[in-house]
């Protein structure tokens, strides 16, 4: 190295397996750091003690090191990490006994040999304790069986709702508005199957197969099944209404994102576009689905009132009859309360999965 070259201030520290060099240069540009024949060579442009210039230095290490240094440039300095070939404690950094003038200990990271050994021992103990704790946790012999069941469940539901969505979309393009009025007769069997199978989601939550809370699952499953089996299934007059098309369509679109997301999660796979769709699509679709359910209830109330279906007459002097249409009006209020509970839950889930990550303060 030429005598006229500028050398930056370099601070060093060590552990049993690593060497740390902190080069006091700010705004570093074009750093060239290499190790050959156990000599580290450094050259870079940056702002040091002599202003903005090109600085360089070389260090011949006391003992063999790995030839691949790791560099990390910050606005204020450049950090170099070098791996020792053998775990040992060096009495000095350089092969030459006299310390170069530009080199000094890094007291921010400095440990003597006993401190370093204590740190190494603590890490080993922490690793051993972690292994002991993991060994104490009982292994679930049915883990793979449970995972296989959840994957198959979500796959079947995804295929079922995909069939509903594709069938309705094709019919809409071919028949136009006419497809609105016979949706129930062509789609109901598959919807019955999917919504009956959805009862398993409540069971899965009850027995702890999934970590999803129970109440949102109960609200959604029983809410949909009440509309499907009680309101639509029992009134032929409702089965030809256009609202059935929109109701089934919104339900199926929501599940096209939900079930594949859960299926991939069971396999330990995260696909970010699908995660975004899972926790974003509900924002327009859940209100639209809730609106379709409300319209369905409102249209069915006069029919239940006129036919007296499911109304209960009590044998008493006042001849009081509990009208099912009145219960539907009460249920209409409960519907919006249930939607609010699910909206709140989904909003929290969205913040958890898509919100900004909190940075830990050092």
Curated annotation (Swiss-Prot):
One of its GO terms (molecular function) is very-long-chain (3R)-3-hydroxyacyl-CoA dehydratase activity. One of its GO terms (biological process) is fatty acid elongation. It is a multi-pass membrane protein. It is found in: Endoplasmic reticulum membrane. InterPro entries: CS_dom, HSP20-like_chaperone, Tyr_Pase-like_PTPLA. It catalyses: a very-long-chain (3R)-3-hydroxyacyl-CoA = a very-long-chain (2E)-enoyl-CoA + H2O; (3R)-hydroxyhexadecanoyl-CoA = (2E)-hexadecenoyl-CoA + H2O. Residues 111-135 form a coiled coil. Residues 171-189, 234-242, 304-319 are lumenal. Residues 1-149, 211-212, 264-282, 341-362 are cytoplasmic. Its EC number is 4.2.1.134. The keyword Hydrolase does not apply. Pfam families: PTPLA. Keywords: Coiled coil, Endoplasmic reticulum, Fatty acid biosynthesis, Fatty acid metabolism, Lipid biosynthesis, Lipid metabolism, Lyase, Membrane, Transmembrane, Transmembrane helix. The active site is at 286, 293. PROSITE patterns: CS. Pathway: Lipid metabolism; fatty acid biosynthesis. The chain crosses the membrane at residues 150-170, 190-210, 213-233, 243-263, 283-303, 320-340. Residues 5-94 form the CS domain. Belongs to the very long-chain fatty acids dehydratase HACD family. Catalyzes the third of the four reactions of the long-chain fatty acids elongation cycle. This endoplasmic reticulum-bound enzymatic process, allows the addition of two carbons to the chain of long- and very long-chain fatty acids/VLCFAs per cycle. This enzyme catalyzes the dehydration of the 3-hydroxyacyl-CoA intermediate into trans-2,3-enoyl-CoA, within each cycle of fatty acid elongation. Thereby, it participates in the production of VLCFAs of different chain lengths that are involved in multiple biological processes as precursors of membrane lipids and lipid mediators. This is Very-long-chain (3R)-3-hydroxyacyl-CoA dehydratase.
